[in-house]
Amino acid sequence: MGFYMNEQIKRFNLLMSEIDTAYHEAALKLGMSDSTMLVLYTLCSYGGECMLGDITSGASKQTVNSALRKLESEGIVYLEAFEGRKKKVYLTEKGRLFAKDTAFRVIEIENEIFALWSDEEKSIYIDLTQRYLADFKEKVKEL
């Protein structure tokens, strides 16, 4: 059985993998795991507090919970009950300083890159990525 993959898909997959690797390298350079970076990055993107579900979407709950427990024990974050069984995650003051020196630096890099792109380029990139994701999810349902 011969396998065929469109050359553009190969390139796309390689680029996606290289982007993941670049974020992993950023986390390592900043002295943290990918899961810790995910938690801090998400908290930064929500202004220092968010629902636990905002962090766990797109990641393993077990991995996120391990990172949260570690960050909580270090005084970086704290969790509070919110509307029944939901939980909200907050950066402490120490956490805000830590996030500013770590995850926020990655956000600044992203902002610098996007600032170099025209509004049209940003819209095209986001729209096509969103469309690809939606189409891919639909096809996965058919598996």
Please describe what each predicted stretch is.
Residues 51-53, 69, 87:
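Residues within the helices of the helix-turn-helix
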Residues 1-30, 76:
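N-terminal leader segment of winged-helix/HTH proteins
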Residues 41, 66, 127:
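DNA-binding alpha-helical recognition surfaces that contact promoter or target DNA
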Residues 11, 18, 22, 38-42, ...:
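Pre-recognition alpha-helix immediately N-terminal to the DNA-recognition helix
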Residues 72-127:
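Charged, amphipathic alpha-helical coiled-coil/dimerization segments
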Residues 1-2, 120-143:
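C-terminal regulatory/oligomerization modules of transcriptional regulators
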Residues 63, 67-70:
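Residues within the DNA-recognition helix of helix-turn-helix
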Residues 21-63:
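N-terminal helix-turn-helix DNA-binding core of bacterial DNA-binding proteins
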